[in-house]
Amino acid sequence: MAAKEVKFSDDARTRMLRGVNILAHAVKVTLGPKGRNVVLEKSFGAPTVTKDGVSVAKEIELSDKFENMGAQMVKEVASQTSDVAGDGTTTATVLAQSILTEGLKAVAAGMNPMDLKRGIDKAVAAAVDEIHAMSVPCTDSNAIAQVGTISANADESIGKIIAEAMDKVGKEGVITVEDGSGLENQLDIVEGMQFDRGYLSPYFINNQQSMSAELENPFILINEKKISNIRELLPVLEGVAKAGRPLVIVAEDVEGEALATLVVNNMRGILKVAAVKAPGFGDRRKAMLEDIAVLTGGTVISEDIGLSLEKATLADLGTAKKVQITKENTTIIDGAGSSEAIQGRVAQIRKQIEDTTSDYDREKLQERLAKLAGGVAVIKVGAATEVEMKEKKARVEDALHATRAAVEEGIVPGGGVALIRALAKLRDLKGANHDQDVGISIARRAMEEPLRQIVANAGDEPSVVLNKVAEGAGNFGYNAATGEYGDMVAMGILDPAKVTRSALQNAASVASLMITTEAMVAEEPKEEAPMPGGMGGMGGMGDMM
């Protein structure tokens, strides 16, 4: 085992603070509408220019092990806030740096770190209650657009396109962000349920222009197993042919003579039919087939429930207004399932989302929920260069997370004002002893810091602006973009309550841990052996000529 280096008390905390300051100074310059750019070197290609706090934080790795530990802990604050609320990473970093700096001064002056932590926790709990109390539900698309605009560093086009996407697919709908091919952002809406499986044979195509199979008012057969024997299918095919309607088959696979017979029937015009593979794998495939069955009012033909293909009737088939199948995707539009059954299925998936601990499972469940509840919107980000594309895409994703957070927990006035108003409620808060009171005042001082930083980045005087905002009430604040004071909500400067709350809680949590740190252990740096010397010159060879 490699030898370890151990640092104690003040020495450890000072090294840790140095690392925190390096990271925080690099990140906090991006805060606010007048935030500055940070240029990140890439191992190949052009450097990346960004105003996204979490992108900057992720790039920072320090050579000193102890300083790096401090930087990594604050990086954790930023990424934790980003995971929970999708935004607020820079605010969280600014808060953590302030709490730690003031906290370590108090520890150096002889205060008890545990009492300081208790005081900070008490203040944060009271401030979070106040943030909840002042939050206003975010329902109209105008407010959603404003939240998106603020989060995307004052880019109105991003705010508008996110609001439009939410209008189209609903609050539960899936909104994905992709690289576009033009200069402008584009919004594509996929109506109905779409899954990533295409036709099993190109002979099913009936629309040569779009190279797709389009079936109006079809029956939909949903089968869990492979279909290779045509005899299994005959009863269903005869029933569908008599009804004179098209048929879509969704199964694990359709192969051999079964596929050949379907293709021949389709080409001769005896029966309009198309077959696709079932989406997903394993248990997720079963669940998705059940979703399709609920959406179309059909039944999954499965041995688990004692149903076989030979015994299936038209009553077991689902129906829809239209099914569109391309090489890669299948879209079911306007399924005939009852709204009660669909709502029941949606409620069941929501419960699974609440109970799951896996981020991957949660993402997949949310996709299934959206396909049942609303639809899918795709935002295609347009830009002139690849560097701009990456930066813009990161901002769109941030803004999307922020608007989701706003819909979830409501909105508060932005620009650091919510924390100033919450701070006013902490004036009468008292701890159990003097050291806890100092902890409370550390948290209060930190809550001023985001506003100070926004103002400093805009090139104004932080103390003057802070006093004027503190004298005001309600939504009164400072618009750093224009240099004016006024009602922040009326000016469209809003923050999701969830973002402000998460930033404060995560910053206080990690900063309190660092204040109560008494020892740090890291591997001793290895001394690199010098490179061996090269071979000497081979003098005297000239005489051999």
UniProtKB/Swiss-Prot annotation:
Catalytic activity: ATP + H2O + a folded polypeptide = ADP + phosphate + an unfolded polypeptide
Subcellular location as annotated: Cytoplasm
Enzyme class: isomerase
Entry keyword set: ATP-binding, Chaperone, Cytoplasm, Isomerase, Nucleotide-binding
GO biological process per UniProt: protein refolding
Subunit-level organization: Forms a cylinder of 14 subunits composed of two heptameric rings stacked back-to-back. Interacts with the co-chaperonin GroES.
Family under the similarity heading: Belongs to the chaperonin (HSP60) family.
Record-given protein name: Chaperonin GroEL 1
